[in-house]
Regions:
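Class I S-adenosyl-L-methionine-dependent methyltransferase catalytic core
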Residues: 1-143
Length: 143
C-alpha cells in the first residue's frame, strides 16, 4: 500500500485507474482529468462504488498539454515542427513550429482527489496560475 498517488491517467482508462488506485492508497489518490469527465452516468456508478471525490480543483487557465515527445526537456519549447499539419487552400497550416513555446490549451482540466472511505460532500474550488486556490464567494444574492 502507498500513502498518496498523483497521476495523469490515459483518459480512456481513467475509471479503471481510479478503481485500482483507491484500493492501493491509504491517504489520497489525485487524478488530472478533463472537466467533461464528470458529466457521465458511468461516473455516478463509479462514485457509488468507490465513493465521491473529496475535492475537485478546476484549473482556471487551460494548460497546454502537447505530447511530451514534441517538447525539449530543457527549454520546454517544441523540438520539431507540427508533424500533422493541415492543408487549407493549398497551404500547410502548422499548429506549432520548432522553437515555439506552447500556448494555452483548448481543453478544461481538473484535479480530482479521492480518499478511501470518504463519505462527505465534494468540495470544489478553482486553481489559477501558480496553483493558488481562489475561494468561491457568492457575489450576488440567490433569487
Amino acid at each position: 500500500r502507498v500513502d498518496r498517488i498523483w497521476v495523469t491517467p490515459p483518459f480512456g482508462l481513467a475509471v479503471a485507474f481510479v478503481r485500482h488506485a483507491v484500493k492501493l492508497v491509504d491517504g489520497s489518490a489525485c487524478f488530472l482529468l478533463p472537466l467533461k469527465w464528470l458529466a457521465s452516468e458511468t461516473r455516478q456508478d463509479l462514485f457509488r462504488e468507490v465513493g465521491r471525490p473529496q475535492r475537485i480543483y478546476v484549473l482556471a487557465n487551460r494548460p497546454s498539454m502537447p505530447p511530451g515527445k514534441f517538447l525539449d526537456g530543457e527549454t520546454g519549447r517544441f523540438n520539431c515542427d507540427d508533424p500533422f499539419p493541415k492543408e487549407k487552400n493549398g497551404e500547410l497550416k502548422y499548429r506549432w513550429r520548432k522553437g515555439d513555446k506552447p500556448g494555452g490549451g483548448a481543453v478544461d482540466f481538473m484535479w480530482v482527489k479521492f480518499v478511501p472511505g470518504y463519505e462527505g460532500p465534494t468540495f470544489m474550488d478553482w486553481l489559477s496560475r501558480g496553483g493558488q486556490a481562489k475561494p468561491y464567494r457568492r457575489t450576488t444574492k440567490p433569487h
